[in-house]
Amino acid sequence: MFTFLFGDVLKEPKIESRTFSGTQRRDVTFRNAADKVPWFDWKIQHGIASLLIECKNTEALSYDDLRQTAAYLGKHMGRVGILASRKHHGEDVLKMLNVFVNNEEKYVLVVNDQNLIDWIRLKDRGEDPTDAIADLYRSLREGAQ
């Protein structure tokens, strides 16, 4: 789905990408081949040569789900990642996400099925869903204290 939505900038998906030591497994990573905003800006500002996407098939996201995704982010994976979940998340999730932004400058962009459906519709109409994901980043960044 992310290849369809952002295939012009996200290349070479690796499913269940493992660290060399084999201790961590990431659901999907993409090479960030962007040369335009916002993906290029994120590559430079946050070091995302590879974009991490974690997927959770749960009713509600827990702190551990968010913490796990944030733990993958850092010097080697960059400081922006995506957590895809089935359901809409509430204000409690936004508060938890702000902890990662405030304390570690890690941005976990949470998307759900409805976001993805809306973005697919945009793409089908010939529009670019990049603005929608940039809005998620901006709201998280501006919501930080």
Model-predicted segments: where are they?
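Catalytic core segments in nucleotide and nucleic-acid processing enzymes
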Residues: 1-145
